[in-house]
């Protein structure tokens, strides 16, 4: 996970964040967060009839939340325990992804064209 990489390389990551490589670091964190969330949301979606576009949107929403949290954590000198925070957020948000996927089953087809990277 991205947090493990950051924890294992705190000094390097902090230097990157405070340098010209900040944008690259943010892109990397965003990319890793996306892979994690896409896999997780797809796994939860297996037993639903959620629309493909909604699966993508839900994963993207949580990718943004996760990556922003990690970037903010780096920006504030990584003083809090990311595992404890992640665990707590997980407990607070438990079931929301499945609930959103179930809602997708009953929504009209989404016809707007867009691409998320």
What are these regions (language model features)?
Residues 1, 14-15:
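Two-component histidine phosphotransfer core
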Residues 18:
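Phosphate-coordinating loops and pocket residues in cytosolic domains that bind phosphorylated ligands
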């Amino acid at each position: 996970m991205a947090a493990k990489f950051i924890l294992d390389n705190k000094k390097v990551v902090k230097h990157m964040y405070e340098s010209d490589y900040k944008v690259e670091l943010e892109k990397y964190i965003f990319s890793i967060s996306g892979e994690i969330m896409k896999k997780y949301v797809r796994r939860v979606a297996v037993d639903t009839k959620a629309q493909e576009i909604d699966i993508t949107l839900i994963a993207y929403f949580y990718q943004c939340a996760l990556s922003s949290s990690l970037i903010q954590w780096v920006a504030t000198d990584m003083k809090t325990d990311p595992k404890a925070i992640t665990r707590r957020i997980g407990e607070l948000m438990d079931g929301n992804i499945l609930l959103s996927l179930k809602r997708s089953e009953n929504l009209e087809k989404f016809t707007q064209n867009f691409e998320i990277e």
